[in-house]
């Protein structure tokens, strides 16, 4: 389902787009619903457990997002080579991606395991002792899983790059089913609490990584590692990957560090606010499923278009995918808006936490419809064209000026509480949207030489 042989016609038929998108939609739905189920299961242990998992997951996401930026770089390079019909270099770039991910994730995991308590103290400062105890347990086991989630993300990105999103969907299914089954057994069956939740996540990620690496070696896969020697680090393909991966990693890293700063601010509002924020973040991802789906589809579609030299088609498909994201976001957010009073009852929150959670999610529903797709789906088109430095610059500046600084002003000066934290995020979205729309309209993002 890669680009067609004749570049004069459409590179992706409606059927090809549908075949790419529906597994991504199912994969995102699985990921979000299973993530919510994970939160629900941990919630049974108490608010301290929910708070600890929420805090550590914000740190986990920081680390995983930085490392997964390498997967984005590899996917962009591979998709452009596939668009050019150069399967040999596409395969070599895939092998180099696996090497870089393997080395970097092991190194980061070891550091986090050795310094787990120190890192938590530096990032989150003084928190309740029960929360810290649970957090250290969860973080230590999470660090063991970094190499496996890294290899899974790399393999999934490469399968999407060639238009085969079914494999990444199946890997996600394997990972999430094992995670939920493991939670049921370890949390409820053996009473292991937070440790059980972390072990279930680890086991799921191990199976997902093994599955996707096994599928990678299928003889019909154009991005399979053909020779063991291809895994030996080589300068040119690594530099190509890093040309996208480093700016994207810095962007993701600074974005998540900013979120951690905001999480530290949220932690000063009390356990109820931490729990409300954790559940609001979890529930809001339901409404983001259509947007995340189209964001994942954007990189392989636009990457192959630009690899084939079809700039007009790149612009056209970007508009189609962004429009689809907005339409889906409108429907999902409208549904969540009306269902939220019922949904919040699933999470065993106190009355105060439930009220805070419902309030911020309702505001999220409104802003997401108008600004999420242009903040997060559109920049993936720019990245697919090699414009990662621009998206990095905008994201970092907007994040720190608006989401971080404004959040502190809203909370500390105007005493808006958790609502102030979320309004800082909404204003960040508005700034990003304006910058990315202007950049896209000018067309400079298509002028980069990536391969």
Predicted regions and their residues:
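N-terminal transmembrane alpha-helices
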Residues: 8-40, 44-45, 61-73, 77, ...
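Short runs within selected transmembrane alpha-helices of multi-pass transporters and secretion channels
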Residues: 71, 141-160, 168-176, 197-212, ...
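Helix-terminus/linker motif at the lipid-water interface of multi-pass membrane proteins
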Residues: 29, 33-51, 120-129, 185-192, ...
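Small-residue hotspots at the loop-to-helix junctions and early N-terminal turns
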Residues: 47-58, 135, 139, 198, ...
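Short alpha-helical transmembrane segments in multi-pass integral membrane proteins
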Residues: 1-24, 78-145, 189-246, 302-368, ...
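Transmembrane helical elements of multi-pass membrane transporters/channels
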Residues: 19-38, 141, 175, 204-208, ...
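Hydrophobic transmembrane alpha-helices of multi-pass small-molecule transporters
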Residues: 62-65, 179-183, 209-213, 286-289, ...
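Small-residue-rich hydrophobic transmembrane alpha-helices
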Residues: 50-110, 149-168, 274-340, 371-396
């Amino acid at each position: 389902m890669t680009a067609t042989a004749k570049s004069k016609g459409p590179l992706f038929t409606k059927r090809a787009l549908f075949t790419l998108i529906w597994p991504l939609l199912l994969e995102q739905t699985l990921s979000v619903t299973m993530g919510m189920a994970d939160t629900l299961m941990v919630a049974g242990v108490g608010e301290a457990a929910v708070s600890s998992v929420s805090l550590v997951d914000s740190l986990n996401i920081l680390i995983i997002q930085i490392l997964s930026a390498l997967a984005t770089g590899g996917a962009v390079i591979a998709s452009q080579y596939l668009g050019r019909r150069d399967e040999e270099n596409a395969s070599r770039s895939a092998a180099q991606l696996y090497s870089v991910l393997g080395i970097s994730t092991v190194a980061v995991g070891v550091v986090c395991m050795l310094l787990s308590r120190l890192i938590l103290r530096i990032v989150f400062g003084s928190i309740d002792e029960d929360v810290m105890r649970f957090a250290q347990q969860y973080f230590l086991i999470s660090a063991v899983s970094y190499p496996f989630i890294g290899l899974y993300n790399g393999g999934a990105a490469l399968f999407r790059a060639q238009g085969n999103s079914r494999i990444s969907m199946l890997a996600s299914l394997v990972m999430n089913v094992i995670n939920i089954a493991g939670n049921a057994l370890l949390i409820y069956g053996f009473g292991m609490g937070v440790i059980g939740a972390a072990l279930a996540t680890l086991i799921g990620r191990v199976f997902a990584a093994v599955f996707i690496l096994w599928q990678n070696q299928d003889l019909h896969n154009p991005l399979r590692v053909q020779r063991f020697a291809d895994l030996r680090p080589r300068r040119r393909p690594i530099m190509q990957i890093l040309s996208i991966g480093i700016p994207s990693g810095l962007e993701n890293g600074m974005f998540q560090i900013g979120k951690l700063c905001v999480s530290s601010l949220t932690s000063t509002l009390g356990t109820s606010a931490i729990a409300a924020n954790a559940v609001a973040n979890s529930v809001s991802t339901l409404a983001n499923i259509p947007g995340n789906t189209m964001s994942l589809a954007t990189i392989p579609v636009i990457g192959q278009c630009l690899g084939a030299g079809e700039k007009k088609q790149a612009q056209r498909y970007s508009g189609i995918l962004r429009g689809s994201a907005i339409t889906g976001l409108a429907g999902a957010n409208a549904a969540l808006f009306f269902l939220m009073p019922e949904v919040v009852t699933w999470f065993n929150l106190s009355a105060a936490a439930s009220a805070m959670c419902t309030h911020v999610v309702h505001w999220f529903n409104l802003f997401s419809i108008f600004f999420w797709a242009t903040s997060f789906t559109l920049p993936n088109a720019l990245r697919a064209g090699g414009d990662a430095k621009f998206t990095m610059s905008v994201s970092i500046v907007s994040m720190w000026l608006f989401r971080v600084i404004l959040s502190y002003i809203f909370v500390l000066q105007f005493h808006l509480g958790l609502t102030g934290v979320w309004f800082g995020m909404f204003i960040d979205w508005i700034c990003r949207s304006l910058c990315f729309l202007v950049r896209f309209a000018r067309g400079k993002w298509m002028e980069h030489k990536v391969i």
